[in-house]
Amino acid sequence: MEKLRVGIVFGGKSAEHEVSLQSAKNIVDAIDKSRFDVVLLGIDKQGQWHVSDASNYLLNADDPAHIALRPSATSLAQVPGKHEHQLIDAQNGQPLPTVDVIFPIVHGTLGEDGSLQGMLRVANLPFVGSDVLASAACMDKDVTKRLLRDAGLNIAPFITLTRANRHNISFAEVESKLGLPLFVKPANQGSSVGVSKVTSEEQYAIAVDLAFEFDHKVIVEQGIKGREIECAVLGNDNPQASTCGEIVLTSDFYAYDTKYIDEDGAKVVVPAAIAPEINDKIRAIAVQAYQTLGCAGMARVDVFLTPENEVVINEINTLPGFTNISMYPKLWQASGLGYTDLITRLIELALERHAADNALKTTM
């Protein structure tokens, strides 16, 4: 059987650049090399695309705090549409190896917000994960919450700040509506980038300023007292949910360093120590949230489980991490689907959706 060429797109002009490098390394290591050849398409912090050497594409690969994309001499350009050579060398115009399917693992801005997905759609390339609309909606916490709320799903009460209205909403108003503690977040960031826990007016002002450094829109959320539970969802039209896992914190909240740098900042418990009926309840809610937002391929649904066993949806991540400590692959492994088979299934789902899209009529 002829191998498929999988283009792994990673890195990116994003605050989550280093997380993406870690994810890409694990996917490259785990992919079924009897079925797939890998083409590494690295995006540096300036947004320039490169074709990377699979044997030597990372610096400090085993150090999450200092991992970096090794510079490459080959810059990449992409030709939209159905072409034999979709990728060309940007410097000399010569064709580069073709790819059959793209596995995007660019976390954060321009990677999981629909931007990259739109480019791949225009290029007529199959790709792993959700389409443009679902990616954009899940990236924007304000939009996510509105859609989940309209579907009757439980979310934390919140207020949305913009640069236009931020000075018209006082801390007293926010505290009156949401109470304390509060969580202040950039609307369009992941991995807890720019997120602050707030218990005072002074902290609130600092937190809002920080969040606006990363986005034009900021979410202020009521702090929910509860356990942090995560569930992995996989599939297109008939998605399946994994067993649940729990993030047990040793720090104040699940910040960026806790997730990716400080190995002692949190403990990942899979499966979560919850009653079977609660596990099933969360799995059903995760699938409902996934379908409400129109997700495809994969997503991780994060919820809070209150002491009263109320499930409050926190967020939906359409390109979850594949780092050494990432929950998504661990949840499927605990559910009987190993890392290599998970990657294979994600590629299959991408090809299935692309075939279905191409079967749609484009003329009257």
UniProtKB/Swiss-Prot annotation:
GO MF terms held by the record: ATP binding; D-alanine-D-alanine ligase activity; metal ion binding
Protein EC: 6.3.2.4
Cofactor binding note from Swiss-Prot or TrEMBL: Binds 2 magnesium or manganese ions per subunit.
Catalytic class of the enzyme: ligase
Named cofactor requirement(s): Mg(2+); Mn(2+)
Domain named ATP-grasp: residues: 145-348
Binding site for Mg(2+) 1: D302, E315
One annotated GO biological process: peptidoglycan biosynthetic process
Segments passing through the bilayer: none
Highest taxon of the lineage: Bacteria
Pathway(s) where this gene product acts: Cell wall biogenesis; peptidoglycan biosynthesis
A cellular-component GO term for this protein: cytosol
Keywords: ATP-binding, Cell shape, Cell wall biogenesis/degradation, Cytoplasm, Ligase, Magnesium, Manganese, Metal-binding, Nucleotide-binding, Peptidoglycan synthesis
Location within or outside the cell: Cytoplasm
Reactions catalysed: 2 D-alanine + ATP = D-alanyl-D-alanine + ADP + phosphate + H(+)
Residues that coordinate or bind ATP: 175-230
Residues noted as binding Mg(2+) 2 in the record, renumbered to the chain: E315, N317
Pfam family, one: Dala_Dala_lig_C
Family the entry assigns: Belongs to the D-alanine--D-alanine ligase family.
Functional note: Cell wall formation.
Name under which the protein is recorded: D-alanine--D-alanine ligase A
Species this chain originates from: Escherichia coli (strain K12)
